[in-house]
Curated annotation (Swiss-Prot):
One of its GO terms (biological process) is negative regulation of transcription by RNA polymerase II. Residues 161-170 have a biased composition (Low complexity). DNA-binding protein that binds to the 5'-CAAG-3' core sequence. May function as a transcriptional repressor. Seems to act as a transcriptional antagonist of NKX2-5. May play an important role in the development of craniofacial structures such as the eye and ear. Its main location: nucleus. Residues 28-170 are annotated as: Disordered. It comes from Mus musculus (Mouse). This is Homeobox protein HMX1. Belongs to the HMX homeobox family. The lineage of its organism: Eukaryota, Metazoa, Chordata, Craniata, Vertebrata. Residues 89-98 have a biased composition (Pro residues). It is found in: Nucleus.
Length: 332
């Protein structure tokens, strides 16, 4: 019993080894060698029979091409070799579905997939590959979007090319005009106002009027504008600017006064402490009449930056001035 169980176990690898890739390739190579030997003999016979002396070179080339296709497609794996060599049936150039070697390529061989290989899709071997039929190719081409071939031109470009090109040219021509209009509008909105240049006589008249009145009524503004040959708007704007300048000057003066020391701007009044004596008091004592006294000057107002005031009585020369003045006529 154990010997009988072990013998099938040993035979299983032998049976499974027949499906290995090396065995399959070896069998395929043997079949290809036999077919090439038979094809060589048939080719020699056909060349002896089908080569007329007066055959055209173009016809000879076509005949040789057909022989190569027949020779490549015969035997096991012939279709795969024809597909690899590009000798299979060549469809017209044009778009094709995926799995083709480029749109409009030389081959139209599509690997068939079947279910049941592990529950998924398994491609068949190269021996079972075959070109698609006309119906299948039509369905495949209609299911997938077409892409242009080497010598084809896109339909949209040929049909709508001139129209779209004209529209693009018109849009490009209109673009600078639109940009220029937009910049013109922007510049128009940002345009600076022109400044009015006043003459000296106009400025003098305006300044004198401003010293009298800070604000003008509409009638006064109209009369002043007519006399100065200006518009009422110009006179109005000038007075507005002048009032703003006047307010800034007042604010600057107040700020300077607040920052200066407190005793620097104080004014001090200094009274005059002497008076000339009347002539009646000195008349009887003197043998000659006195000259009439000079009129007394008005009391001066002296201002000092400091806080101290110095009276004139502190100076003896200033106190003896009347006596010297009274004695000067006698000395002469």
């Amino acid at each position: 019993m154990p010997d009988e169980l072990t013998e099938p176990g040993r035979a299983t690898p032998a049976r499974a080894s027949s499906f290995l890739i090396e065995n399959l390739l070896a069998a395929e190579a043997k079949g290809a060698g036999r077919s090439t030997q038979g094809d060589g003999v048939r080719e020699e016979e056909e060349e002896d029979d089908d080569d007329p002396e007066d055959e055209d070179p173009e016809q000879a080339r076509r005949r040789l091409q057909r022989r190569r296709q027949q020779r490549a497609g015969s035997g096991p794996g012939g279709e795969a070799r024809a597909r690899a060599l590009g000798l299979g049936p060549r469809p017209p150039p044009g778009p094709g579905p995926p799995f083709a070697l480029g749109c409009g390529g030389t081959t139209r061989w599509y690997p068939r997939v079947h279910g049941g290989y592990g529950g998924g899709l398994s491609p068949d071997t190269s021996d079972r590959d075959s070109p698609e039929t006309g119906e299948e190719m039509g369905r495949a081409e209609s299911a997938w979007p077409r892409c242009p071939g080497p010598g084809t031109v896109p339909r949209e470009v040929t049909t709508q090319g001139p129209a779209t090109g004209g529209e693009e040219a018109a849009e490009l021509a209109e673009a600078p005009a639109v940009a220029a209009a937009a910049t013109g509008e922007a510049r128009g909105g940002r345009r600076k106002k022109t400044r009015t240049v006043f003459s000296r006589s106009q400025v003098f008249q305006l300044e004198s009027t401003f010293d009298l009145k800070r604000y003008l009524s509409s009638a006064e503004r109209a009369g002043l504008a007519a006399s100065l040959q200006l518009t009422e708007t110009q006179v109005k704007i000038w007075f507005q600017n002048r009032r703003n300048k006047w307010k800034r000057q007042l604010a600057a003066e107040l700020e300077a006064a607040s920052l200066s020391p407190p005793g620097a701007q104080r004014l001090v009044r200094v009274p005059v402490l002497y008076h000339e004596s009347p002539p009646a008091a000195a008349g009887p004592a003197l043998p000659f009449p006195l000259a009439p006294p000079a009129p007394a000057p008005p009391p001066p107002l002296l201002g000092f930056s400091g806080a101290l005031a110095y009276p004139l009585a502190a100076f003896p020369a200033a106190a003896s001035v009347p006596f010297l003045r009274a004695q000067m006529p006698g000395l002469v």
